[in-house]
Swiss-Prot record:
Cleavable signal peptide: 1-18
Species classification: Bacteria, Pseudomonadati, Pseudomonadota, Gammaproteobacteria, Enterobacterales
GO terms for MF: calcium ion binding; lytic endotransglycosylase activity; peptidoglycan lytic transglycosylase activity; sodium ion binding
Single GO BP term: peptidoglycan catabolic process
Enzyme class: lyase
Record-linked PROSITE patterns: PROKAR_LIPOPROTEIN
Primary site of residence: membrane
EC number of this enzyme: 4.2.2.n1
Topology within the bilayer: Lipid-anchor
Record-linked Pfam families: SLT_2
Protein name (database record): Membrane-bound lytic murein transglycosylase B
Amino acid sequence: MFKRRYVTLLPLFVLLAACSSKPKPTETDTTTGTPSGGFLLEPQHNVMQMGGDFANNPNAQQFIDKMVNKHGFDRQQLQEILSQAKRLDSVLRLMDNQAPTTSVKPPSGPNGAWLRYRKKFITPDNVQNGVVFWNQYEDALNRAWQVYGVPPEIIVGIIGVETRWGRVMGKTRILDALATLSFNYPRRAEYFSGELETFLLMARDEQDDPLNLKGSFAGAMGYGQFMPSSYKQYAVDFSGDGHINLWDPVDAIGSVANYFKAHGWVKGDQVAVMANGQAPGLPNGFKTKYSISQLAAAGLTPQQPLGNHQQASLLRLDVGTGYQYWYGLPNFYTITRYNHSTHYAMAVWQLGQAVALARVQ
């Protein structure tokens, strides 16, 4: 739920094999004995090592105390693991770039911002890759639709925008990212300390080596880029193998669908409807809420029936030559629970629609 990246296209089976950030054990793998309350580590990570980038960091020491007292972690092993974590200045810089700013003035008129954003995701090659993903995991997508009520195009749209259907899941060690942000980023240290706590619990429960798992610079994981807290609340074992693996596309499909259901997705309902007319005098955005009669009084009419909806948010998209207005319905708002952005939600929806259309052509 962070990041935007682009790569050249390769055959799907090559890409999915290459990008997996959760190594699979083989018959020749050996693991060391696991102390009570500890992790199942690979031999190269089971070292008697003290020091490291966070050795004298009081926040790190307080975190270790909490994990031992609250969750029963093995203190020595946890110290050894954190001593192998790296402080990543690049992560701190990227987070600063994500910070909200009030110094940039909004454009005085339309400049095509929506079109530029849309072109990052909705391209012929990307749509075709979405078709391949949908076809490969059609059974899981249809099952998620039946179980959670979320249609395949929404799940495909989310995974496409987040990771190009698994092609770009991040190359940063999650432990490094979350430790850096927990111990050296005061502005959001409390939040990321909670994410690190949940990440280590996940690794212990799933018997993963926490030093092996990779994701985004902010610690987002797998096909759907779940943060550890989202894993804890919404991730599911959709493949039925007894493990929750966000780097497994089937588990990711079920987890994304469960996330949407939990955030109010209404099965079979509309997402948004384009409007005729302009309403420059009304505040816009996915957080707004107007009665349909208010929008009509402002000069807007829906291009398609709105069903039984009596209220909508007013969405405005900058298309360069002017503004495009939309009625945002509750399912549109649900998409924004994944990423709080009108552009993001519209890109997810339209990408999924484009892939669905391409499958039948």
